[in-house]
């Protein structure tokens, strides 16, 4: 039984792909309907006026206008105000 036992297997050596989360537009910036405003995990930012939320909590503009970041009741809201 002159067999050599197989070596161990490396358990490191993998890396997850980047998720590109975060705020995509600045306060006061003009956006068009459908533009993505925030990509997030969970509701760090809540949808305000003229802002919709996708299944993955992505916030997007429903109308053309200027972006406004607001805070009410200890919650952060992103709104789009038409000009």
From Swiss-Prot:
Q: Which InterPro entries match?
A: Ribosomal_bL27 (IPR001684), Ribosomal_bL27_CS (IPR018261)
- Name of the protein in question: Large ribosomal subunit protein bL27
Q: Name one Pfam family in it.
A: Ribosomal_L27
- Which UniProt keyword terms apply here? Ribonucleoprotein, Ribosomal protein
**What does the record give under GO molecular function?**
structural constituent of ribosome
Query: Which gene holds the coding sequence for this protein?
Result: rpmA
GO CC terms, sorted:
cytosolic large ribosomal subunit
What are the BP-aspect GO terms? translation
Return the similarity comment.
Belongs to the bacterial ribosomal protein bL27 family.
């Amino acid at each position: 039984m002159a067999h050599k036992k197989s070596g161990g297997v490396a358990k490191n050596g993998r890396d997850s792909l980047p998720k590109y989360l975060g705020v995509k537009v600045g306060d006061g910036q003009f956006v068009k309907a459908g533009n993505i405003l925030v990509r997030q995990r969970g509701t760090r930012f809540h949808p305000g006026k003229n802002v919709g939320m996708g299944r993955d909590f992505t916030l997007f503009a429903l109308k053309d206008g200027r972006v406004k970041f607001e805070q009410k009741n200890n919650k952060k809201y992103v709104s789009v105000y038409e000009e």
